[in-house]
Regions:
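Glycan-recognition and catalytic cores of secretory/periplasmic carbohydrate-active enzymes
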Residues: 1-373
């Protein structure tokens, strides 16, 4: 199929996992065509449980693009284009803070492959739409939940605003993305490198009021997926701006993840949760692995870069084992087991989750490859 080799210690195992991932995704899109799942229920993608918010449609298409680019197979390319077109109307969706998650894995990859300016315009429009969520008084992009709220997750979406600012060019878009990152750095990243999920602001004055959480154990605890979003997202902010503050914050968040997580690299849903019933949040680990590979390429300290790269490899070796990979679990439709969507709402707990699938595939694809702008 023309697959690129993976010049890393993971080597053959990584290729086998990508082959398995392709088989699972092929089953998903042929069994449930034009369906965008968020998480499995009992290992099955199709169910009628709550979504909470629709933010995952780009991850399925993103995997299709990775498979198309890795294999050169027109079957994957046709489906990647199809699933990307299905979400195009959301380029003007002002109800969510997740347009980066939707359009960066899909339409941005499509543009990178073709250079077609019509495709690029969709990415730019999504970035401009996301920037409309900016609160000038508080200097933050508001979450989907409320006007006085921002989430650490949004750090993963600011890249599409930076990109739009760069391509147009538009200095106001650059200001918006930069100020949001600085606000998040100041109020959601703590002195020890841990992160809060949510920040609450006074709508009249813009003053920061308090840290909060929707998916962690407590307002002052450390939700693992949010930590992974931060180490990845601040790395991306540094990649676009060259602002050393963002690199330092990404490294601080990465160091906290590594220091607090067991040697195998997979954190629980929240490090402060006492005696968790589910000890693993595999999607946070997959995000962290991909973010650490990016960070290893960004840092100019060789020892630190090697540390991040080796830890990312440790995570991936763990996730590629039968404990986490569904390869030896008959009837399980996902790729990666033991993910958690929303523990408080009991949604997608100890299941496969679509972002966990995507970031595992992205991390494996990233091995040995330079970071992509």
């Amino acid at each position: 199929m023309g697959d690129r080799a993976l010049p890393t210690p993971l080597g053959k195992a990584a290729q086998q996992v990508l082959d398995f991932a392709q088989a699972q995704v092929q089953h998903l899109i042929t069994t449930y065509p034009d369906y965008f799942p968020l998480y499995t229920s009992g290992g099955r993608w199709h169910h009628e449980q709550e979504a909470w918010t629709n933010w995952c449609e780009g991850f399925l298409g993103g995997m299709l693009w990775i498979f198309a680019m890795r294999t050169g197979d027109p079957w994957w390319r046709e489906r990647a284009e199809h699933y990307s077109r299905l979400i195009e109307p959301r380029k003007s969706d002002r109800s969510v803070h997740d347009l980066g998650f939707l359009f960066w894995p899909t339409w941005k990859r499509w543009y990178d492959l073709t250079g077609d300016e019509r495709i690029q315009r969709v990415v730019i429009e999504a970035g401009r739409t996301l920037a409309l969520r900016f609160n000038e008084r508080g200097r933050y992009l508001r979450s989907f939940l409320a006007a006085d709220s921002t989430f650490i997750d949004i750090m993963m979406n600011t890249g599409i605003i930076f990109y739009a600012a760069e391509q147009l060019p538009d200095p106001d878009l650059l200001r918006i993305a930069t100020e949001h990152c600085l606000t998040t750095r100041r109020f959601l990243v703590r002195g020890d490198g841990s992160t809060a999920h949510e920040g609450i602001f006074d709508l009249e004055t813009g003053a920061f009021l308090r840290q909060s959480t929707q998916q962690g154990w407590r307002a002052d605890s450390s939700w693992a997926r949010g930590q992974a979003w931060a180490l990845y997202g601040f790395g991306t902010a540094y990649r676009f701006t060259g602002d050393a503050r963002f690199l330092a914050t990404a490294q601080q968040c990465a160091d906290f993840y590594i220091e607090r997580t067991p040697a195998h690299g997979v954190a629980p849903n929240d490090w402060e949760e006492p005696h968790p019933a589910h000890p693993y949040e595999s999607s946070a680990a997959a995000i962290a692995a991909s973010g650490l590979l990016q960070l290893a390429d960004l840092t100019d300290e060789p020892t630190r870069a090697q540390h991040y790269r080796e830890y990312a490899h440790t995570i991936l070796i763990t996730l590629c084992s039968p404990t986490f990979l569904a390869i030896e679990t008959p009837g399980w439709e996902g790729i990666l087991k033991h993910g958690i969507y929303h523990q408080r709402k009991n949604l997608g707990v100890d299941e496969s989750v679509m972002w966990g699938e995507y970031f595992l595939v992205e991390a494996l694809d990233r091995l040995g490859q330079p970071i992509r702008s």
